[in-house]
């Protein structure tokens, strides 16, 4: 897999979402991919490429916060450990939320929940390389066209604790055992998925990513438009 260089964009190339303008749904976008030291981050990068966007990969330890607004999307990768141990991850969420459409995957999803006031709980049983059924519990364009329920790949030992979820976050998908598999902010273009869309165990992963990349960034109707 070829290296993906981090290329800070100039303000003149900033996202039109920041000015309130609308993109055509299939327009190419520059996506800041925040690498939380996950061994399969390049699979996520490849999904972004396949969706017609240009990925710009940077370590979670080195994200220049003042350039986040210059991108059209911010994608938080999975990674080991807990969100609070992942460099500037919390700061990235705080900076991007409300400015740039934001999607967190696994660890990134957990970081979003924590920044907005939620907590995590450790699972009694680790899910590593496990295919699980996932059911949609709130309309979200991310999951448009997928079977109901749909299958996802899980690689985690922590989940967002439903009992601590703040009112500003809405659950959009659950596993069969009731674990939060996806959530979104009620008023901001911020969403997260606990499962791995880049995994071979998630057959609809590319569809989910394409919906996110092609959405116009409207808060109503979910992160997928």
Give the residues covered by each predicted segment.
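Catalytic beta-strand/loop cores that center a nucleophilic Ser/Cys/Thr
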Residues: 140-187
């Amino acid at each position: 897999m070829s290296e993906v260089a981090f290329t800070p964009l100039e303000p003149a190339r900033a996202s039109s979402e920041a000015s309130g303008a609308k993109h055509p749904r299939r327009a190419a976008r520059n996506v800041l991919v925040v690498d939380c030291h996950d061994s399969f981050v390049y699979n996520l990068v490849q999904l972004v490429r396949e969706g017609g966007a240009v990925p710009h990969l940077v370590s979670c330890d080195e994200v220049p916060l003042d350039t986040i607004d210059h991108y059209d999307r911010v994608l938080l990768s999975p990674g080991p450990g807990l969100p609070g141990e992942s460099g500037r991850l919390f700061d990235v969420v705080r900076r991007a939320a409300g400015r740039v459409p934001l999607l967190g995957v696994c660890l990134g999803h957990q970081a979003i929940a924590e920044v907005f006031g939620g907590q995590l709980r450790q699972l009694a049983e680790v899910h590593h390389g496990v295919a699980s059924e996932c059911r949609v519990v709130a309309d979200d364009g991310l999951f448009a066209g997928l079977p109901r329920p749909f299958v996802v790949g899980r690689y985690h030992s922590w989940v967002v604790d439903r009992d601590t979820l703040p009112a500003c976050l809405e659950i959009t998908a659950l596993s069969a055992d009731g674990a939060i598999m996806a959530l979104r902010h009620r008023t901001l273009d911020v969403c997260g998925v606990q499962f791995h869309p880049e995994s071979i165990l998630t057959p609809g992963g590319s569809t989910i990513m394409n919906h996110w990349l092609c959405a116009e960034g409207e808060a109503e109707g979910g992160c997928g438009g």
